[in-house]
Amino acid sequence: MALARQATDFSHGIGANPFKGMSREQLAAIAYDDSGKFTVNERHAAWHEAYDQEQAWRVRVIAQGDLEYQGTGKQNGFFAEVLKHYKGLPAIEQAQYPDNYASKLQYWISLDFNFHANQAEGGGTSYPSVVETLLEQGPHARNGAMIAASATRDTPAAH
């Protein structure tokens, strides 16, 4: 009952999120629960924390990917980090991505594409706007493209 009150306070903007720092697996179990065990406000607070964690991860991985791109012209580490993140998501969140998401990431890694030289140093061919494509998918994608655009716009390489 206390947790429900805290979640209600959070939903009304007068308290901290009681689920802050909880694992993605636990958050998904609450946010997507339809058994009636959790209140709407608890489910909302859990979803909000998962969203906040996802956005923090996206900001970090985009910054790392930008550094990789600036230094090497490649995005292999970025794609590998995205694939690792995807594989670590709860199954209910993975299900919200396209069926071929993991294989597409693996393919992009195998391309070993050098964006500075504009050529694949591995096998296969290139895809346009791969970062935007990736970040427009998934359960928390709404702001993904906006984050990618602001991250690349605010870097020296983008000017």
Descriptions of predicted regions:
Residues 1-159:
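Type III/flagellar secretion export determinants
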